Amino acid sequence: MLLRTSLSQRTLSPYRELASYHLNKSGRAPLQSEVESRLLHRVEKFLEGRRETAESLLEEVDVWMWNDDSRQLELMEVKPDVAARLRAAELARTLYEINPGSARNRELHLLSQLEYLKRQSGASDQIKVDQFLKQADNISASEVEGLLSEAIKLDLIHAATAACEVLKEVGGEAQIVSSDMRPLVNAILVGDRHLQFAAFDAIAEINPKIAYAGSSYVAEVAAWFASSRFVKKCAVGHIRSEVAQAWSIATGPRGWGSVSADSSKDFFEQATSDPDIGILLISDSLQRPSQRELVRQLRSHWKTRRMPIGLLARDADHLIKSIRYTEGMDRLLTFPLSLDDDAIASQLKQLEGQESTWTVSSDDRYRHAARSVEWLESAAVDSDLDYYHIGSHQKQLLGLLYHPEFTSSAAKILATQPTAVAQRTMLGFVSQGDLPIEARELVADAFEDAVKRGGTMLTTREIQLQYERYNASENQPAETQKVLGRVLDVIEARRNQLKQ
């Protein structure tokens, strides 16, 4: 405190002189350059999590914080990582006050504030942007963009996420539209789910009307989020189905679903298309590509590069080789192949420990999906946003029809897609008598819009099938016959229009 008071440019001169007097009285007052150098080193270590403290061993830490509103110190219980970043924020603030003219001092001060604020708010809630802007001395959107870039470079995921949340409120098209990918788009490629969503959400809020580098990633991540089923899963790759079955049985009680593949190609496709997969298990039985090549491919892909991977070794010789291969590699562990429930549960627990410090909850998955569906609907009907080519993600969007909360939006999206697959899917939905009639009527509306936009894309056989469905519905409720008759009227009206 005396050091800050004696060196801070914000301290009134009499107080600075008094603090310097007491420092000299107690011993030699350090030079400003010495203080800056030491603080700089400590801030960087705290920020990057390289400075271990006694509190690191505790689950909760008591810290005293000054509340500007109440004008008094308040006791808070926080997690050790939050306490470490709080300490970094305090030190960085001192560093900045000592020499506010240093660009690096300001950058570390603001980065540490972002890192701390995000760890304090948690993954599911946005930081208090006004609080950050108040501390940031008229920061510009361009400077926030620079902070995002530096946070990505330093792997400060929380700070990067917070920077995206700030850009959502203060950013503009200049932070997105470019012939080179801007940091907001690059943030999607880092591979952290919460950071990906924060970047997407900011871009969706800014809503540029001009094509830009990396726009395809934005549309893809939106369709990926939207296809979530809100249940975390692990993916198991092995040529024997009983291995996947054993993992499915053992992981269920721990809240995990399970999917499997018996080839490297299918495993990669599954891992990069299912947004609910969070842990990967790869057996050395998979070939073409080999287990190690598959790992390299997954580490290179923006959806899977940060996922924990467990390598399953078939015997002791392969286990030893795999342990040597994974030594010192982040989020990569080796296990002996086992069908035992307890052994699998233990392996899963170790992989969970390799996950991001903030997990993705079912509520998070739903929130990400809902925001993405909202944006996809608006992008699909806005001709200014045609450059996103929403139709190229049609396969992932078809299933949204069967999710009650998203049926209406999915129908409107599919209505803009002049494809046989979209029309066939809508007719299949309308024809299912066990679905709510209100939802079927919504999709019938969308089918009519689709035909008006691009004509009928169905084959003669598919149209005949629809007549058969109508004829078979004579014993079903009247509203079912009505909605089935309506889509036939739409088809016939189009036919008659073409004959004229």
Predicted regions and their residues:
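Structural detector for internal amphipathic alpha-helices that build alpha-solenoid repeat scaffolds
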Residues: M1, P14-S26, Q131-A136, H158-Q175, ...
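Amphipathic alpha-helical scaffolding segments comprising HEAT/armadillo-like alpha-solenoid repeats
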Residues: M1-L7, L31-L40, A141-A151, A174-A187, ...
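Short coil turns that connect the paired helices of HEAT/ARM alpha-solenoid repeats
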Residues: T5-P14, Q135, E150-H158, N186-H194, ...
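Short coil/linker segments at helix-helix boundaries
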Residues: E34, H41-L91, E115-S142, S178, ...
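Conserved acidic segment of CheY-like receiver
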Residues: F230-G252, L280
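Short hydrophobic/Thr-rich beta-strand motif most characteristic of the beta2 strand and flanking loop
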Residues: G255-S263
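Acidic, metal-coordinating helix/loop segments flanking the phosphotransfer/catalytic sites
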Residues: D262-I279
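Conserved phosphotransfer microenvironments
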Residues: I279-R306, L312-K321
